[in-house]
């Protein structure tokens, strides 16, 4: 049975990544916390697939909205940084990613995917998990999708904004509406 994570401290991580500059570097939850940033951490199964580029590029296309909300976006798969870079360097018209505005991290030892409960052990790939972590490192939101279904960026932004209100948000709440 899966352990509850929401409301608890999120598992800490540091991973190699391809940064928005296309340089290799590292990303960590600690760095986001030190910078007083929210973290939108999402896992996807693998590079060079069909659904993944649609959601990865959609998140990048809306990155400025996340940035306006003091949130850093980090995409994660179990692929290597070299595979990530090759995919980023592939044009979107050819099922590539093109330039991204946030890092893609490489969880090659599967440790982070396992700690967040999204690793499909027998396949060595992650489910589509989405985790929103506040600047204090507390996991505020988690959802896991079947790998055939891409995420909704509008919903991710709505949930992030709802969490940032600090209030009670009723069903179908939209940014700008009153909380309870």
From Swiss-Prot:
GO biological process: cell redox homeostasis; hydrogen peroxide catabolic process; response to oxidative stress
Its EC number(s): 1.11.1.-
Top-level taxonomic group: Bacteria
Domain Thioredoxin: residue ranges: 4-165
Entry annotated with the keyword Protein biosynthesis: no
Biological function: Thiol-specific peroxidase that catalyzes the reduction of hydrogen peroxide and organic hydroperoxides to water and alcohols, respectively. Plays a role in cell protection against oxidative stress by detoxifying peroxides.
Subunit description: Homodimer; disulfide-linked, upon oxidation.
More about this protein: The active site is a conserved redox-active cysteine residue, the peroxidatic cysteine (C(P)), which makes the nucleophilic attack on the peroxide substrate. The peroxide oxidizes the C(P)-SH to cysteine sulfenic acid (C(P)-SOH), which then reacts with another cysteine residue, the resolving cysteine (C(R)), to form a disulfide bridge. The disulfide is subsequently reduced by an appropriate electron donor to complete the catalytic cycle. In this typical 2-Cys peroxiredoxin, C(R) is provided by the other dimeric subunit to form an intersubunit disulfide.
Protein name as catalogued: Putative peroxiredoxin YkuU
Organism: Bacillus subtilis (strain 168)
Lineage: Bacteria, Bacillati, Bacillota, Bacilli, Bacillales
Name of encoding gene: ykuU
């Amino acid at each position: 049975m899966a352990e509850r994570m929401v409301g608890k401290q999120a598992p800490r991580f540091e991973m190699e990544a391809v940064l928005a500059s296309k340089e290799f570097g590292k990303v960590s939850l600690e760095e986001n916390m030190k910078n007083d940033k929210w973290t939108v951490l999402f896992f996807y199964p693998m590079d060079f697939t069909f659904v993944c580029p649609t959601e990865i590029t959609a998140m990048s296309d809306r990155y400025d909205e996340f940035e306006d909300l003091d949130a850093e976006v980090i995409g994660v798969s179990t692929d290597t940084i070299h595979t990530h870079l090759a995919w980023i360097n592939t044009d979107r018209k050819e099922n590539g990613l093109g330039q991204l505005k946030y890092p893609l991290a490489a969880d090659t030892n599967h440790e982070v995917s396992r700690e967040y409960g999204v690793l499909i052990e027998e396949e060595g790939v992650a489910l589509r998990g989405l985790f929103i972590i506040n600047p204090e490192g507390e996991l505020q939101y988690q959802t896991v999708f079947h790998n055939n279904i891409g995420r909704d960026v509008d919903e991710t932004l709505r949930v992030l904004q709802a969490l940032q209100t600090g209030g009670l948000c009723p069903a179908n709440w939209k940014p700008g509406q009153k909380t309870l």
